[in-house]
Amino acid sequence: MLRAACLAPFFAILALAVPAMADAHYTVSPSCGNQKHCFTRLQSALDTAKADTRDHWVTINVAAGDYYEKVTISRHKIRLSGAGPDKTRLHFDAVAETAGKYHRRNWGTPGSAALTINADQVTVEGITIENTFDYLTNDALPDADPKRISNSQGVAVLLDIDSDRVLIRDAALIGYQDTLFANGKRAVIRDSLISGNIDFIFGNGQVLIEDSEIRTRNRAVAIAPGEFHSYLLAPSTTLIQPVGIVVYRSKLTREAGVPDHSVALGRPWHPTTTFADGRYADPNAVGQASFIDCVMGAHIHPDHWTSMNGTARDGTKTAVFSPQDSRFFETGSTGPGAAHRDIGITWKDALDITAVRRHLFDGWPEASAP
């Protein structure tokens, strides 16, 4: 016992003398030449990083360029850093109708993602991530046209089931339907652009979008006055989670051609789920969405929120889920789209931004400061 006590200071000094594990660094570039640790494909760099099982950060610097590939991040502590969203672009053109082959359960929507993040502690910055499926050409086809693709979802970024503590900043996430699929745990998107039209920010994840732009893109079909052109959010937050999709201090904008008073802030998504007594819309997916101190353009519909159909117990899409039965909240809205009709939204248990931050940043100090 005495000997151990005498040796304790020695081991303490030795521990202090051991340097911290250095981060690993790789480069992705359209042309590497003789440069070491350089790859022409992003997935090759990520695969090499995954083979490194040490508990340190791996930084992958992605040079300016246009990268057409489908990418998955499955290693923890990855930092993906582009040259700027106007210089570095990752894109892929998969669509849900045919993308099941890319997914572990043959599901087309998550399979369509240009970038899948399925790991803890991931930072993505300085890059555009785009699903380039030709949505508008397909949208213009008549329903009876055999060339029309019915499942036209095209995800740009999938936050998959094992993702947590994902920070996306100074980035552009571009698509049309289902641009950002939040299907994991915590994520923060900061100083970025997210664009799309149909339910283009959706899922059961806990996401804070702050100091960003949410831009509605056009449709190829004419929308009658009073009808909904697009929907920003479609949360499917489980009841046990107090935070779903929170948009803070951001601007809601539109492309030219998107009509006034035509875009809903959100609608409740109850995903079709298999239970012991059948397959139907999940009654426990009571979506939570908040808009806090946001500037809303004139394209926002005066009702602000709307309903969404789901799968009934008989298998038909006749179950209707209303915003009044969801966890929708807004406060501090400004701009021409801020005024709205009272449609009976009464839920008052939303967390304020301080509480949202406290909930999301527990054990994640790196994301707490802009």
What are these regions (language model features)?
Residues 1-8:
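Bacterial N-terminal signal peptides that target proteins for export
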Residues 23-370:
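Sequence-level preference for short, compositionally simple segments enriched
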Residues 1, 21-22:
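Initiator methionine at the very start of the polypeptide chain
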Residues 17-19:
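N-terminal signal peptide c-region/cleavage motif recognized by signal peptidases
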